[in-house]
From Swiss-Prot:
Function: Forms part of the ribosomal stalk, playing a central role in the interaction of the ribosome with GTP-bound translation factors.
Keywords: Ribonucleoprotein, Ribosomal protein, RNA-binding, rRNA-binding
Underlying gene: rplJ
CDD domains, A to Z: Ribosomal_L10 (cd05797)
Subunit structure: Part of the ribosomal stalk of the 50S ribosomal subunit. The N-terminus interacts with L11 and the large rRNA to form the base of the stalk. The C-terminus forms an elongated spine to which L12 dimers bind in a sequential fashion forming a multimeric L10(L12)X complex.
GO-annotated biological processes: translation
Species name: Listeria monocytogenes serovar 1/2a (strain ATCC BAA-679 / EGD-e)
SUPFAM superfamilies: Ribosomal protein L10-like (SSF160369)
InterPro entries (alphabetical): Ribosomal_uL10 (IPR001790), Ribosomal_uL10-like_sf (IPR043141), Ribosomal_uL10_bac (IPR022973), Ribosomal_uL10_bac_type (IPR047865), Ribosomal_uL10_CS_bac (IPR002363)
PROSITE patterns: RIBOSOMAL_L10
Name of the featured protein: Large ribosomal subunit protein uL10
Keyword ATP-binding: no
Protein family per UniProt: Belongs to the universal ribosomal protein uL10 family.
GO terms assigned for molecular function: large ribosomal subunit rRNA binding; structural constituent of ribosome
């Protein structure tokens, strides 16, 4: 087997593995961004633990078909980059959507969220959600509210009884 064919097969295997292992994957068209803007985007994604890589569309198409993600083939035209996140489902969509607001040249095309193909609208909706940490803090506040209310009521009763005794 030729070295070129082996390299292509290993690239397809790498893409398949990343697609199946990632919690969230977003495909973007980066045409029109200059090197400085792409470097800035890569830094933002890297800081959030997201891998951002450019693959040939033909190799990506083979990996997508092997993983059974029908519906992504239409997004695999033109210069594309793929953002893979293994932990946070919201982070790639949020970072890319915020970057696209400031840089109109970046176009979000489609993605895969927890094993399901997602359209542009679904990714934009996901981008409006708070991060995992934000959701956990909201949950903590909701769980603390009844206990806090009970503590305030108990203190009020104690203060009232002290006022009556005095």
């Amino acid at each position: 087997m030729s070295k070129v064919l082996e390299a292509k097969q290993s690239a397809v295997e790498e893409i398949k593995t990343k697609l199946s292992a990632s919690a969230s994957t977003v495909i973007v068209d980066y045409r029109g961004l200059n090197v400085g803007e792409i470097t800035d985007l890569r830094k933002q994604l890297r800081d959030a633990g997201i891998e951002f890589k450019v693959y040939k569309n033909s190799l990506t198409r083979r990996a997508v078909e092997a993983n059974g993600y029908e519906g992504l083939e239409g997004a695999l035209t033109g210069p594309n980059a793929i953002a893979f996140s293994n932990e946070d489902v919201v982070a790639p969509a949020k970072i890319l959507n915020d970057f696209a607001k400031d840089h109109e040249a970046l176009e979000i095309k489609a993605g895969v969220i927890e094993g399901k193909v997602a359209s542009l609208e679904e990714i934009k909706a996901l981008a409006t959600l708070p991060s995992r940490e934000g959701l956990l803090s909201m949950l903590c506040n909701v769980l603390q509210a009844p206990v806090r209310g009970l503590a305030i009521a108990t203190k009020a009763v104690a203060d009232q009884k002290e006022g009556q005794e005095a």
